Amino acid sequence: MEKTSMFSIHEGKPIRCKAAVSRKPGEALVIEEIHVDPPQAYEVRIKIICTSLCHTDVSFSKIDSGPLARFPRILGHEAVGVIESIGEHVNGFQQGDVVLPVFHPHCEECRDCKSSKSNWCARFADDFLSNTRRYGMTSRFKDSFGEDIYHFLFVSSFSEYTVVDIAHLVKISPDIPVDKAALLSCGVSTGIGAAWKVANVEKGSTVAVFGLGAVGLAVGEGARLRGAGKIIGVDLNPEKFELGKKFGFTDFINSTLCGENKISEVIKEMTGGGVDYSFECVGLPSLLTEAFSSTRTGSGKTVVLGIDKHLTPVSLGSFDLLRGRHVCGSLFGGLKPKLDIPILVDHYLKKELNLDSFITHELKFEEINKAFDLLVQGKSLRCILWMNK
């Protein structure tokens, strides 16, 4: 049997399937039957095998005003699937390929995509509000009443089937377990890449990571892979400290136990003047200031991964900048999805990269609201939701 034959019955036609739909802000997702249209030019339709969720999904499910408050919507942006059907002008992909949908675009054609200096995509990355990458607000999802459902970050993986533009698609080796591969769609890649590509952490260097969620722990894993000599984790939750050891963390600071001392002062004392690299993974301006102050004068580098939901301006000392400290942002860890995710997959297959420890729970897709609760309560790092288990 050809590997495409299992998909041919639905090719070119709408598919009925289950999806978890976010109907109203702050309310539980609703499992319902939807229709997923066939892919158009430069798109593929994917059968999702498994998906996970991160705090971005939780945050967007609660937004109740402004342009980001769109309902009904299918959330989800970390997943692995198999290509079910292909639209016109799709090159490099075929039915049956195992693929990773990624929120960050990589068109491979614009100036930035061709440059080694950036992972920005000048062609597509400025638009994160449309439903489909090349067709604006046109939706590929309809509910049982024929009403459109909004997409999310060009992925929408909380559905048995979804339609994704090839600029957001990475073909991966079928040898990697799909639950581990799903982690590379967003948070874990973001953290590893920040240490690997953005900071370019050197062997024997010192690192401080502020916030030990999945992204922060992944920064530690990336720093470990690069051979960092000391990796300091900063968090309010002491339970994260034991977990952090699995990802290479050597030292921990509970910020509530610092007394009158600033976190940056404690770090400077521990390292003899400050760390070579610091990473802010929470999104608090005050924490960014501390991360910046914790680095060495003359060469210290601070990488910003957290997003302040209020977009508050940050004030940094001009004299500190003048004396050689650096600060930079990091979107998706500086990774070019189509080039760098396969490299991370290869590291995992060679048993060099720890992905297994990020998965703390596995549930059926129908239990998705339980997964949300676990994440909000701080009991889950990454929960894998299986579509057909």
Curated annotation (Swiss-Prot):
Q: Which residue spans adopt a coiled-coil conformation according to this UniProt entry?
A: none
InterPro entries linked: ADH-like_C, ADH-like_N, ADH_Zn_CS, GroES-like_sf, NAD(P)-bd_dom_sf
According to the UniProt record, what class of enzyme is this? oxidoreductase
Localisation: Cytoplasm
What binding details are noted for the cofactor?
Binds 2 Zn(2+) ions per subunit.
Necessary cofactors: Zn(2+)
What reaction is this protein's catalytic activity? a primary alcohol + NAD(+) = an aldehyde + NADH + H(+); a secondary alcohol + NAD(+) = a ketone + NADH + H(+)
Identify the GO cellular component terms for this protein: cytoplasm
GO MF = alcohol dehydrogenase (NAD+) activity; zinc ion binding
Sites binding NAD(+) sit at 56, 211-216, 235, 240, 305-307, 332, 382
Task: Tell me which residues bind Zn(2+) 2.
Answer: 107, 110, 113, 121
**Keyword entries, A-Z:** Cytoplasm, Metal-binding, NAD, Oxidoreductase, Zinc
Instruction: Give me the residues that bind an alcohol, please.
Output: 56, 77
Query: Which Pfam families does this entry report, sorted A to Z?
Result: ADH_N, ADH_zinc_N
Q: What is its EC number?
A: 1.1.1.1
Binding, Zn(2+) 1:
54, 56, 77, 186
Q: Does the keyword rRNA-binding apply?
A: no
- What family does the database annotate? Belongs to the zinc-containing alcohol dehydrogenase family. Class-III subfamily.
Q: How does it assemble?
A: Homodimer.
Protein's UniProt name: Alcohol dehydrogenase-like 5
Species of origin: Arabidopsis thaliana (Mouse-ear cress)
Lineage, opening ranks: Eukaryota, Viridiplantae, Streptophyta, Embryophyta, Tracheophyta
